[in-house]
Amino acid sequence: MSKVLAMILAGGAGTRLEPLTRERAKPAVPFGGRYRIIDFVLSNFANSGVYRMKVLTQYKSDSLNNHLSRAWRMTAFLGHYVEAVPAQMRTGLDWYKGSADAIYQNLNIITDEEPDYIFVFGADHVYRMDTRQMLDFHCTKKAACTVAAIPVPIEQGREFGIIDVGPDGRMRQFLEKPKDPPPMPGNPKMCLASMGNYLFSTDVLVQEVVRDAANEASAHDFGKSIISELYKRAPVYVYDFAQNEVPGQEAKERGYWRDVGNIDVYYQSNMDLVEVDPTFNLYNDRWPIHTQPNNYPPAKFVFADEQNHRVGHAMDTLVAEGCIISGGSVRRSVLSPKVRVNSYSEVEDSLLFENVTIGRRCRIRRAIIDKNVEIPPGMTIGFDPVEDRRRFHVTPGGVVVIPKGMKVT
């Protein structure tokens, strides 16, 4: 069997997710109540049988490193591991200059591991994928590099790096946010957008990052600097993610992929989960999303005084372990562990991170409340845009964001 290594890029600053990334790396941002964003790519590899994973970290990585050490302990004596690799300045006094430079600065890992193939994936996307199918495609095509791509409506192609492919799937051109995107073969209404996930034959990857490092004018980015040149001189193929089949996945879920690059997209991706029949279903035990186990008690709902409107209940909501809904109402929301909603309060269309407390008689709507925040009794959030902007961060889509540990008065 071929030796495969996954190198996961988790060193980006994640500035577009501020203030959620003010104290943590983007891949460590909570998602879906009990997960971190990075859990999705790691689960995809583990479920695919790829058990050697190096996570390249850099900015504000403490929370991410803690999560990896607690949630991703694998069977070391079988050679299985998930290891965080902090930026070490092995090639000079510079941090990572880009995604390609992150690999270049860690070529020692490749030398030590001696893999035949290397996955280079991002750590900040939400999706399910059987990566072995991409490897099979790569080997069948005898590709130097394979790029995962997702079909998007052609009118949205201006927002992505778009790939022009031939009928055999070989890349003919890579275009960054083109005004006139080329359609994908056989479907003039769709085009192929790069997912930022790559698979290389090892010798090709090493050769290309060394070549890129010698170019002082390079952006040292895989899409802009490596792929945009490699396809001109080597067989680069495009793997259509929409063809990927995951056990237990319904047809409507195939091709679900979200780049949660800004808060409005991140918010909506969480809201996707609370639908009665969600497009992305967390409840697929044939392809589970793994994360840190905890010893919190079950969620609890207390008080049923309907006459005085003091009924603890939640509808169309994900409620994690350790939560207590104490006479409050929660609708269309996602609650992380140890959240408490007190009597007579109403929470709607919101994300409450771990250890958030909502005092009595509060009204919360379309808000993201980060970890360790206490909302005092009687507070109203999400109903007065002017007042919300005066006190908090409000996104272009109108979502109110309260940072981790903020003292709300």
From Swiss-Prot:
One of its GO terms (biological process) is glycogen biosynthetic process. It catalyses: alpha-D-glucose 1-phosphate + ATP + H(+) = ADP-alpha-D-glucose + diphosphate. It is an enzyme of class 2 (transferase). Alpha-D-glucose 1-phosphate binds at Y96, G161, E176, K177, S194. Its EC number is 2.7.7.27. Belongs to the bacterial/plant glucose-1-phosphate adenylyltransferase family. Involved in the biosynthesis of ADP-glucose, a building block required for the elongation reactions to produce glycogen. Catalyzes the reaction between ATP and alpha-D-glucose 1-phosphate (G1P) to produce pyrophosphate and ADP-Glc. Homotetramer. PANTHER family: GLUCOSE-1-PHOSPHATE ADENYLYLTRANSFERASE, GLUCOSE-1-PHOSPHATE ADENYLYLTRANSFERASE-RELATED. This is Glucose-1-phosphate adenylyltransferase.
